[in-house]
């Protein structure tokens, strides 16, 4: 008993002593509030972005940021930092260091209580800055990149070296650093530099002789204008964009099967050569299909986000890999257009920047209504018919619909024929075998013991059902039923190995007699949201099954009573099942409202663990997503190209600057966040961004001409030992650029100077010569077939 008493006596005494020590230390540190503030800091205004945020990011954010919020305290968002944490205290109380727990903790001498709890403690200057910042009201500022570009006064400076306003910004900073820029490059070097930069190709001997022989003041400008007008210009800049669009002529993953998407590459070349304004360039790629009456070019542009990988391996979960593609689209959009690292937000709030976990899934909601899925056919695709026979059939069908008005116009039927857009993929169906679920993959089977169904299908009075199936023999009749497996039959299809659709004039209806597995047959029109069941009434054979790839409802062709309808009907089904040569390009299309998916937050980033449902939206620190913007990809495109967006123009001009100067004004081109590099010339960056949007009207060629006409670009790249020691990375731009050619440019240059380079543009991708064994895939069996003739010597982007 005495032992217990003495034990508690010492514990209580130690506890009271500790409390006194803590209270005493805190009182001392608070009473002498300027104790750690060096004299030079006492009078200065503390700047959050310059002085405070770097301390938080370096010493605090690992435990009190987007990934972890120890003690319920986060420094990522102002509202969180100033709120009450789990202890009931406020870590930061503006204007009061006495009430700010943060000041107590960073001054504490006891390691158990001092913050940061791990690593080196804050030094005296850091403590002084935090103390003074809170004393001055703890004024929080948004990171510079999230504030829209601000109008800048061009430096009032003159010098014979200066060519345009860009040079005034550069010269002013050099002047401040007591440096002088280099003189102009020699004409040979300058021509080679600008030719490689603007077209990716070296100048020809004729171009070199013409430039060297032109002594006029406009000689260089004439060269620049000629290069901007060259077809090679579009090829050079399309190659740059293809890297950001993750372009490939194959699908990726283990099989890495071929993909026909070269029409998107050709669209890029044309867009750059035609100088499509950048805001339209972005809008068409993100949402060309959602524009009013989209053109073929606008549809092909959407292949930007069909460059995601596709897993053709058997046994994979289609929804899982569809989700992987969605995540890739979110990350690519934010990286390419906003210079923002979004990948980590899939699992948690951003570690350093004001982007919450749910913001990732709000972004994903913009893309979640797309009709594509992880299936081998890569539908939806845009079909281009190569054979004149098929083109004529399509023309006759369009003319027929125009001459016989019905529920839908010719655009509807052209889309039905040219765009493989099945609404109901296998993964929308559930299969039941004797009351037990059967897991589907890329296709699903309907047998005499299995039925399949999908719920909540919006029907709008369509009177035909189209589906694609495979059957090895005559297997019975496929019934389409409403609401249950024993529900009302609205249509039926005899499933045969080989059939063909023909129009029976006497019965005024189609016979089912289709070849090549795509069939369309009459169904009783229904309206509303219904459950659809596919039930096979099989034959007596032991193996009775029909493998279905997709299902869709549509409206019949108009004018069934008119003379000649039989021929048009035959044309319609012939072209749907044509085996003639055709080109298919994967494109983006959204489901109609009735098929819309819900989007949920993935808990810890797992696609199988759904949290709260979210609607399309953007992070709060960016420009607002206004009510006039549609809650789809088109609305996202309008938000990104809104002049109020703080990043789109900055990121874009920075990217083009980097291509010419070798280093961006912001060196971390894909990270404009607080962990990225600050701009070397922030005023110039904002000035260029505002010029690009308001003065140039998003004109890429005008921007590039402005850059290459500057003395900054044209100066010699010679570097002295002194300058190399002072500025080895050329941040100050006291010399001209020294940039490496890309591997593709090295190859193109070698072919060009040897006289072998083919000027042929556009068309399917080619396979130039390469050593045996380089191109190998695991199990697809695809072979590298070396192209012949001039196709072996085309530019690398082909």
Predicted regions mapped to residue ranges:
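Extended surface/linker regions that mediate inter-domain or inter-protein docking
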Residues: 12-17, 22-26, 219-356, 363-364, ...
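Solvent-exposed helix-loop boundary motif
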Residues: 7-8, 25-131, 138-166, 171-172, ...
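Extracytoplasmic
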Residues: 395-578
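Primarily short, surface-exposed interaction patches in extracytoplasmic proteins
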Residues: 158-193, 197-232, 246-292, 353-354, ...
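Glycine- and acidic
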Residues: 115-116, 223, 227, 250, ...
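C-terminal capping alpha-helices of c-type cytochrome domains
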Residues: 48, 118-140, 378-410, 538-540
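Non-catalytic accessory/assembly modules
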Residues: 259-283, 302-305, 311, 331-342, ...
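N-terminal Sec-pathway targeting helices
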Residues: 2-15
């Amino acid at each position: 008993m005495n032992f217990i008493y003495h034990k508690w006596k010492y514990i209580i005494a130690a506890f009271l002593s500790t409390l006194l020590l803590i209270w005493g230390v805190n009182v001392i540190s608070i009473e002498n509030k300027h104790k750690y503030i060096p004299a030079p800091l006492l009078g200065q205004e503390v700047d959050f972005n310059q002085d405070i945020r770097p301390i938080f990011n370096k010493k605090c954010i690992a435990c009190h940021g987007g990934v972890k919020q120890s003690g319920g305290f986060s420094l990522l968002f102002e509202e969180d930092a100033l709120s009450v944490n789990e202890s009931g205290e406020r870590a930061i109380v503006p204007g009061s260091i006495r009430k700010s727990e943060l000041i107590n903790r960073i001054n504490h001498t006891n390691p158990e209580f001092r913050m940061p709890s791990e690593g080196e403690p804050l030094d005296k200057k850091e403590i002084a800055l935090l103390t003074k910042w809170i004393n001055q009201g703890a004024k929080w500022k948004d990171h510079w990149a999230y504030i829209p570009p601000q109008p800048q006064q061009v430096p009032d400076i003159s010098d014979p070296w200066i060519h345009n306003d860009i040079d005034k910004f550069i010269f002013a900073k050099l002047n401040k650093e007591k440096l002088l820029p280099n003189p102009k490059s020699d004409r040979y070097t300058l021509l080679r530099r600008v030719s490689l930069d603007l077209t990716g190709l070296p100048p020809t001997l004729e171009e070199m002789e013409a430039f060297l022989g032109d002594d006029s003041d406009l000689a260089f400008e004439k060269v620049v204008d000629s290069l901007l007008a060259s077809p090679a210009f579009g090829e050079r800049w399309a190659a740059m964009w293809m890297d950001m669009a993750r372009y490939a002529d194959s699908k990726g993953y283990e099989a890495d099967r071929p993909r026909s998407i070269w029409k998107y590459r050709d669209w890029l070349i044309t867009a750059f050569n035609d100088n499509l304004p950048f805001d339209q360039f972005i809008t068409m790629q993100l949402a060309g299909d959602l524009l009013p009456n989209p053109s073929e070019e606008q549809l092909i542009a959407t292949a930007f986000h069909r460059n995601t990988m596709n897993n053709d391996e058997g046994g994979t979960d289609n929804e899982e890999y569809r989700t992987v593609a969605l995540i890739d689209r979110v990350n690519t959009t934010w990286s390419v257009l906003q210079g923002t690292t979004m990948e980590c937000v899939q699992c948690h709030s951003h570690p350093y920047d004001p982007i919450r976990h749910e913001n990732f899934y709000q972004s994903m909601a913009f893309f979640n209504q797309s009709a594509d899925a992880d299936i081998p056919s890569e539908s939806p695709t845009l079909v281009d018919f190569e054979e004149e026979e098929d083109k004529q059939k399509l023309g006759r069908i369009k003319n027929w619909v125009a001459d016989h008005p019905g529920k839908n116009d010719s655009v509807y039927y052209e889309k039905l024929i040219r765009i493989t857009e099945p609404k109901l993929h296998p993964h929308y169906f559930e299969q039941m075998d004797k009351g037990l679920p059967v897991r589907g993959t890329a296709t699903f089977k309907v047998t005499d013991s299995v039925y399949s169904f999908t719920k909540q299908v919006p029907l709008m009075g369509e009177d035909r059902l189209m589906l694609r199936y495979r059957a090895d023999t005559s297997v019975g009749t496929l019934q389409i039923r409403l609401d249950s497996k024993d529900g009302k039959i609205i249509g039926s299809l005899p499933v045969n190995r080989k059939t063909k659709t023909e129009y029976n004039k006497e019965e005024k209806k189609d016979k089912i007699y289709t070849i090549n597995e795509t069939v369309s047959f009459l169904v009783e029109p229904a309206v509303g949201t219904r459950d659809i069941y596919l039930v096979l009434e099989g034959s007596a054979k032991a193996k009775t099954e029909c493998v279905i790839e997709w299902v869709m409802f549509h409206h019949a062709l108009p004018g069934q009573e008119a003379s000649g309808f039989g021929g048009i009907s035959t044309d319609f089904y012939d072209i749907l099942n044509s085996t003639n040569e055709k080109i298919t390009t994967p494109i983006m299309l959204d489901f109609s409202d009735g098929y819309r998916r819900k989007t949920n937050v993935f808990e810890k980033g797992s696609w199988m663990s759904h949290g709260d449902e979210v609607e399309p939206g953007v992070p709060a620190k960016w420009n607002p997503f206004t009510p006039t913007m549609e809650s789809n990809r088109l609305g996202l495109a309008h938000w990104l190209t809104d002049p109020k967006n703080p990043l789109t123009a900055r990121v874009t001009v920075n990217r083009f600057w980097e291509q010419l100067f070798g280093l961006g004004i912001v060196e971390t081109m894909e990270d404009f966040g607080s962990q990225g590099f600050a701009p070397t010339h922030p005023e110039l960056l904002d000035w260029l961004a505002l010029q690009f949007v308001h003065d140039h009207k998003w004109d890429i060629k005008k921007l590039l001409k402005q850059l290459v006409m500057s003395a900054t670009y044209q100066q010699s790249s010679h570097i002295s030992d002194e300058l190399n020691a002072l500025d080895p990375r050329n941040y100050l731009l006291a010399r001209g650029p020294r940039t490496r050619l890309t591997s593709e440019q090295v190859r193109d240059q070698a072919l060009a100077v040897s006289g072998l380079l083919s000027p042929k543009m556009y068309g399917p991708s080619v396979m130039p010569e390469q050593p045996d064994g380089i191109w190998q895939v695991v199990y697809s069996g695809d072979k590298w077939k070396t192209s012949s003739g001039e196709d072996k010597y085309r530019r690398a982007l082909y």
